[in-house]
């Protein structure tokens, strides 16, 4: 089985593939201070609880946290010594031409999402990844990464508002009764849900105007369900898009 690890700034998502099928998945907090042994114990524990502790034949990983990535390398070598490790970084085969001023600036997760989106849905496409930041990644009709938009994420925006406005507090993210809030909590919820939905629709519309044909719009990321029902431009919700991309990149780099 293939273990895939997507390390984000806030959360780490792990998945287990048997062939093309995602058979299990977990979401844990990202902690850059977590050592290789702590990470190994954590993963072994998750696999053991799912009765899948043995049979890992490969590991594929992408990360936006360099310190955590170093520990993954050590963990994989110690805890899964017979399983080849593929880390998405410059020099790895992805099959994705990166049409960016400096390709090394592009986050590994964005390349992974581009590959998965094009493989599953074709192009042109726009991937909207709701994470610590909200990323809009643009895929050409030939599977090229064209660039995109990086915007503050939902949680970051909520935290900033609560910390900078003395009379506002952090609220539970939920759809309010109406876009016209009748109290402070509902007004904040309306701003979050409808504000971010409008951001998605507005940016997607502007990007689509720059493309030669209508793109398929794919939403992914842990915070997507917060606003997805209010987005008018999203065609597909795929919460495991990044995990699928990690599987595809592993297959491109490790022969069967």
Curated annotation (Swiss-Prot):
Reactions listed under catalytic activity: (R)-pantothenate + ATP = (R)-4'-phosphopantothenate + ADP + H(+)
Highest taxon of the lineage: Bacteria
UniProt xrefs under InterPro entries: ATPase_NBD, Type_III_PanK
Active site: residue positions: 109 (proton acceptor)
Locations listed in the record: Cytoplasm
Residues binding substrate, per UniProt: 100, 107-110, 184
Keywords of this entry: ATP-binding, Coenzyme A biosynthesis, Cytoplasm, Kinase, Metal-binding, Nucleotide-binding, Potassium, Transferase
Main subcellular location of this protein, as a coarse class: cytoplasm
Reported function: Catalyzes the phosphorylation of pantothenate (Pan), the first step in CoA biosynthesis.
Protein name: Type III pantothenate kinase
Organism listed in the record: Acidothermus cellulolyticus (strain ATCC 43068 / DSM 8971 / 11B)
Gene that produces this protein: coaX
């Amino acid at each position: 089985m293939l273990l895939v690890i997507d390390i984000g700034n806030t959360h780490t998502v792990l998945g287990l593939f048997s062939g093309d099928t995602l058979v299990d998945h977990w979401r844990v907090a990202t902690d850059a201070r977590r050592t290789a042994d702590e990470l190994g114990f954590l993963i072994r524990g998750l696999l053991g609880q799912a009765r899948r502790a043995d049979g890992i034949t490969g590991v594929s990983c992408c990360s936006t946290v360099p310190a955590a990535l170093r520990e993954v390398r050590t963990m994989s070598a110690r805890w899964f010594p017979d399983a080849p490790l593929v880390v998405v970084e410059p020099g790895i085969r992805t099959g994705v031409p990166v049409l960016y001023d400096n390709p090394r600036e592009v986050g590994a997760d964005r390349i992974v999402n581009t590959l998965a989106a094009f493989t599953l849905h074709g192009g042109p496409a726009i991937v909207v990844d709701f994470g610590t930041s909200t990323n809009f990644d643009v895929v050409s009709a030939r599977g090229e990464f064209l660039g995109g938009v990086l915007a503050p994420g939902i949680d970051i925006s909520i935290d900033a508002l609560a910390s900078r406005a003395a009379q506002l507090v952090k609220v539970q993210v939920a759809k309010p009764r109406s876009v016209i809030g009748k109290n402070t909590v509902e007004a904040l919820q309306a701003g979050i849900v409808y504000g971010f939905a409008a951001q998605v629709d507005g940016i997607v519309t502007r990007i689509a105007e720059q493309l030669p044909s209508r793109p398929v719009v794919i939403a992914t990321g842990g915070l997507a369900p917060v606003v997805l029902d209010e987005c008018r431009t999203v065609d597909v919700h795929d919460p495991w898009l990044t995990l699928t991309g990690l599987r595809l990149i592993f297959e491109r780099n490790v022969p069967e």
